[in-house]
Design a protein with these regions (language model features):
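Helix-turn-helix DNA-binding elements, focusing on the entry/boundary residues of the two helices
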Residues: 17-18, 36, 50
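A short LG(V/I)-centered, amphipathic sequence patch enriched
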Residues: 40-57
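The N-cap/first-turn positions of alpha helices
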Residues: 2-8, 29, 61, 68
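Interdomain hinge and pocket-entrance segments immediately C-terminal to HTH DNA-binding domains
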Residues: 84-88
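Alpha-helical residues within the helix-turn-helix
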Residues: 23-24, 41, 62
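Short helix-boundary/capping micro-motifs
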Residues: 12-26
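A short, exposed helix-loop element centered on a Lys and neighboring polar residues
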Residues: 76-83
């Protein structure tokens, strides 16, 4: 149900590498780049500082990562509660 772009961002942030994130998510590296660019466009900010093959979260990226974890927690709680209702 959640926005896959957030999963892509989270994976890139944790792996520190677009190619490794692509491999883990079973998508292409250009697809990873596209998802990150879409989020950057929507938020109107850079999420990563790129220096060749090295990437580092910007301050905005660090903030998004913090909220991404909270969002995933909310999604998990939502799915749990919905499943509880279905089992009644």
């Amino acid at each position: 149900m959640f926005d896959f772009r957030l999963k892509v961002f989270d994976t890139v942030a944790k792996r520190g590498n677009f190619t490794k994130a692509a491999s883990e998510l079973n998508i292409t590296q250009p697809a990873v780049s596209k998802h990150i660019k879409e989020i950057e466009r929507l938020l109107n900010t850079k999420l990563f500082d790129r220096n060749g093959t090295k990437i580092k979260l910007t301050v905005s990226g660090e903030i998004l990562l913090k909220y991404t974890q909270k969002i995933f927690g909310v999604y998990s709680a939502l799915e749990f509660e919905i499943n509880q209702i279905k089992q009644q």
